[in-house]
């Protein structure tokens, strides 16, 4: 697939990037663009030069595919649901629903019928995206290489753009429910007078609370990305070893990842529910300390 280990690693860890290169740009093959062109990046340098508007086609495609699989599975189970002896798919879906419902009841202290479906969607979707790591590391990138694609990653959660997209959605929901439940004045007051209930400490409180608010999506995104990306790198490094050594290291690492993949989906879901629960709580404040 690649002539050197560096090319092999680059092919597996670089995303399939589509974006716009400016006129006069010299490409990796030595050709010079006569005009600004939307194209697929051939190297990491080209991907960087495409700038902010570049799109990771592999991350986007696999995310949508896993989302579609989630919808089809749960829709099929719902349509085939019966009061009699349930089938295997119905059993699996009911287990997921009951598990997530129990987590939400224990964690979420407000009243919102949308939180449990949201938590279920996040848990199953992230789990499905993580589970792509169970596919042997060379299979799909190898097919992509035969098709002439310069790079290809199949795990959306090993791409920071994917995890930050998820966490940004959660962050928007946190702000939405904070303003909806507490009102603009109530939410602003909470930021200004927590943790110290004194007018002279409002700037310090705002700094702490806004910083804490911004770290929520950062922690969600970086935790998921860090665990998935690190696992991806280890699998790729193991694949570079001689065949007789690969089994010695790959089997225990794969077994370990059987636990990591659902665990990271669970952590992302629980933290999302915790943050949304906090957004629904109107803490209130006593009279200002003079």
Swiss-Prot record:
It is a multi-pass membrane protein. The chain crosses the membrane at residues 54-74, 115-135, 136-156, 164-184, 201-221, 233-253, 254-274. The keyword Transmembrane applies. It holds the Pfam family ATP-synt_A. Gene3D superfamilies: ATP synthase, F0 complex, subunit A. The keyword DNA-binding does not apply. Signal peptide: none annotated. It is found in: Cell inner membrane. One of its GO terms (molecular function) is proton-transporting ATP synthase activity, rotational mechanism. GO terms for cellular component: plasma membrane; proton-transporting ATP synthase complex. One of its GO terms (biological process) is proton motive force-driven plasma membrane ATP synthesis. Keywords: ATP synthesis, Cell inner membrane, Cell membrane, CF(0), Hydrogen ion transport, Ion transport, Membrane, Transmembrane, Transmembrane helix, Transport. Disulfide bonds: none annotated. Belongs to the ATPase A chain family. Key component of the proton channel; it plays a direct role in the translocation of protons across the membrane. HAMAP family: ATP_synth_a_bact (MF_01393). F-type ATPases have 2 components, CF(1) - the catalytic core - and CF(0) - the membrane proton channel. CF(1) has five subunits: alpha(3), beta(3), gamma(1), delta(1), epsilon(1). CF(0) has three main subunits: a(1), b(2) and c(9-12). The alpha and beta chains form an alternating ring which encloses part of the gamma chain. CF(1) is attached to CF(0) by a central stalk formed by the gamma and epsilon chains, while a peripheral stalk is formed by the delta and b chains. This is ATP synthase subunit a. It comes from Stutzerimonas stutzeri (strain A1501) (Pseudomonas stutzeri). The gene is atpB.
């Amino acid at each position: 697939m690649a002539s050197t280990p560096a090319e092999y690693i680059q092919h597996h860890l670089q995303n399939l990037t589509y974006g716009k290169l400016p006129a006069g740009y010299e490409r990796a093959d030595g050709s010079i663009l006569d005009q600004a062109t939307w194209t697929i990046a051939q190297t990491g340098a080209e991907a960087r030069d495409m700038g902010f508007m570049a799109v990771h086609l592999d991350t986007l495609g696999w995310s949508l595919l896993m989302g579609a699989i989630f919808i089809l599975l749960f829709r099929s189970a719902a349509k085939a649901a019966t009061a009699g002896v349930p089938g295997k798919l119905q059993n699996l879906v009911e287990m997921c629903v009951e598990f997530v419902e129990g987590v939400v009841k224990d964690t979420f202290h407000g009243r919102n019928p949308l939180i449990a479906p949201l938590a279920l969607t996040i848990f199953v979707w992230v789990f499905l995206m993580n589970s792509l790591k169970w596919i042997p590391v060379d299979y799909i990138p190898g097919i992509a290489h035969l098709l002439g694609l310069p790079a290809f990653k199949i795990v959306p959660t090993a791409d920071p753009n994917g995890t930050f997209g998820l966490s940004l959605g959660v962050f928007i929901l946190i702000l939405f429910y904070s303003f909806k439940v507490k009102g603009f004045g109530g939410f602003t007051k909470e930021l200004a007078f927590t943790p110290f209930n004194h007018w002279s400490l409002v700037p310090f409180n705002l700094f702490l609370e806004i910083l804490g608010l911004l770290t929520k999506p950062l922690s969600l995104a970086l935790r998921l990305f860090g665990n998935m990306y690190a696992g991806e790198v280890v699998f790729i490094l193991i694949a570079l070893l001689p065949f007789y050594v690969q089994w010695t290291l790959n089997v225990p690492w794969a077994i370990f990842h059987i636990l990591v993949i659902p665990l990271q989906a669970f952590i992302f879901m629980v933290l999302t529910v915790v943050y949304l629960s906090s957004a629904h709580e109107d803490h209130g404040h006593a009279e200002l300390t003079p």
